[in-house]
């Protein structure tokens, strides 16, 4: 009982805060620019992928028509078939490279945004005198008592 009393007195002085980082990030100008840059890259990569797919389809149809007419000598047919296989492999490789490039672009664009957010969280936490700031967007917390935990998402200091 005596041990519980000091803990109870100490617990009353603790301040906790919470934010929703996703709400904060989506209104940052840096986020809008990053999203636009990523969408532009995606459009370019998609256009190139579509162009190579159309080129492959055209050559494949020409090959099929030549085979159907039986107008190709065997060695030319083999060479064209090999060209088609090479085109398919290059296209698959390009698709994999494009996915990796998109993931890297996303990470590169978002890293400074998350750093800025984390720095702002630290500054707001220090200014508000809270012990912890929980991010409800990154870590689901089943219950938040709004009277005991300060919602810092729309912090008046506008550090976010």
Stretch-by-stretch model annotation:
Residues 1-14:
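Bacterial Sec-dependent N-terminal signal peptides
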Residues 11-160:
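Amphipathic, charged alpha-helical segments and their helix-to-coil junctions
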